Each structure stands twice: as structure tokens, then as C-alpha cells.
């Protein structure tokens, strides 16, 4: 069960896989890659609005 986490603004197209080992970092995780891509776009929009 590999979950995808929201990717950073630098690389929107790529979504990083989140391992179950890393419980320290709590980031928005998605079960599918499509959801992760959505997260990326959302985050980028949010950041653009802020700046």
C-alpha cells in the first residue's frame, strides 16, 4: 500500500510516494496518484494567491 503525498511547488508533475515508516512528517496523503496530482495543483494555487 503505497500512498502518494502532495508534491512541492518545484515539481508539480511528479508525486512522491510516502512510506509508512515516516510517521513524523504528517502531510496530506492520497491513496491514488491522481489525487496526489490534484493536491499538487491545489497547493500551487494556494501559494500563488498568498504571494
UniProtKB/Swiss-Prot annotation:
PROSITE patterns: PROTAMINE_P1
Keywords carried by this UniProt record: Chromosome, Developmental protein, Differentiation, Disulfide bond, DNA condensation, DNA-binding, Nucleosome core, Nucleus, Spermatogenesis
GO cellular component annotations of the record: nucleosome; nucleus
Compartments, record wording: Nucleus; Chromosome
Tissues expressing the protein: Testis.
Domain of life: Eukaryota
Pfam families tied to this protein: Protamine_P1
Chain intervals for the UniProt region annotation (Disordered): 17-51
Molecular function terms, GO-annotated: DNA binding
Basic residues composition bias: residue spans: 17-28, 35-51
A GO biological-process term: sperm DNA condensation
Task performed by this protein: Protamines substitute for histones in the chromatin of sperm during the haploid phase of spermatogenesis. They compact sperm DNA into a highly condensed, stable and inactive complex.
Subunit structure: Cross-linked by interchain disulfide bonds around the DNA-helix.
Family per similarity comment: Belongs to the protamine P1 family.
Name of the protein in its database record: Sperm protamine P1
Species for this entry: Pan troglodytes
Gene that produces this protein: PRM1
Amino acid at each position: 500500500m503505497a500512498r502518494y503525498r502532495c508534491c512541492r511547488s518545484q515539481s508539480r508533475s511528479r508525486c512522491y510516494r510516502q512510506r509508512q515508516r515516516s510517521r513524523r512528517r504528517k502531510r496530506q496523503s492520497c491513496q491514488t496518484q491522481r489525487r496526489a496530482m490534484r493536491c499538487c495543483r491545489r497547493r500551487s494555487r494556494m501559494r500563488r494567491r498568498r504571494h
